[in-house]
Amino acid sequence: PSLCRVYKKTSGNESIALYLGKRDFVDHVESVDIVDGVIKVDPAELEGRKVWVYLACAFRYGSDDLDVIGLSFRKDIWVKRIQIYPVVGTRPANTPMQEALLKKCGDQGHPFTFTIDTNLPCSVGLQPAPEDAGKSCGVDYEVKAYIAKEADDPDEKISKKDTCRLIIRKIQFAPGKVGAGPKADISKNFMMSDKPVHLEASIEKELYFHGDPIPVNVKINNETTKVVKKIKITVEQTTEVLLYQSDKYSKTVLTEEFAEEIKGESTLEKTFTVIPLLSNNKEKRGLAVDVSGFPKTYIRPGMDKGMQGIMVSYKIKVNLLVSSGGLLGGLTASMIMHGPMS
């Protein structure tokens, strides 16, 4: 293919350079796009050392400024290494992407290919507060080329001028086949009333694009003499941080109130539309975000949930405000995700 853009990083000593044709790699649930790139090597500066490239999936949980006190805030989940120079063994046939990159870097180019395991998490981060410095908590992927005597010798100190790296993203789209949406219902009796208020809420499908309107269908049967004054719809993001501890918490990403009066012994059937947007939640610390906005984790049957690093799901709550002041109702559904690729 003709390359519209090449991502390139050169080491400080200019002995090696890393080339990629893209930085977003799609997780199709059953498989993941291969990571195919090229390393340009100038052997004159190697001094008998070798050139390696690695792809690492890491979980970070802290700020960079804390590293100065000797604490490690990065945990490698998965690492693969390939010796680039001198060339050893046989290599797979070049991909069209690698052929295009080799034309950019000439005779000193050496292709590499990584296959990302399907059970690894997607790139996601927890949004820091505006005043926070350094990296937030999250999962990222790094491609790094380096010059060393051995691939991974803890006693060998590798100088920064002998390395070059690029951060890439593993992203996930919704499956093309989308299931029917969830439905929840509840009834509640109030004091001084022998009949209940019935609430039913549903959505048409279980997955939505970020930025898409979400129609919430609401049915109310008020058998009491009390008046339903207001309907409140809330969308919550639930995040599970699985790697360093069992940590689960929720953030509200949308709250909207609708002034609908349902008098005693009457009914209402109506659709209310809500649109949760990341742009309305920029100040919220700890909100899970990714390249498209709000992320959602899609798990293949049999996949180890503990490998996902950060699990993200959503629920919608529908509450009725009744004249007595009591709150009624509840709808829980996993529904927001990237849309399918077209």
Segments from the language model and where they lie:
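C-terminal beta-sandwich interaction modules and adjacent acidic
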Residues: 1-342
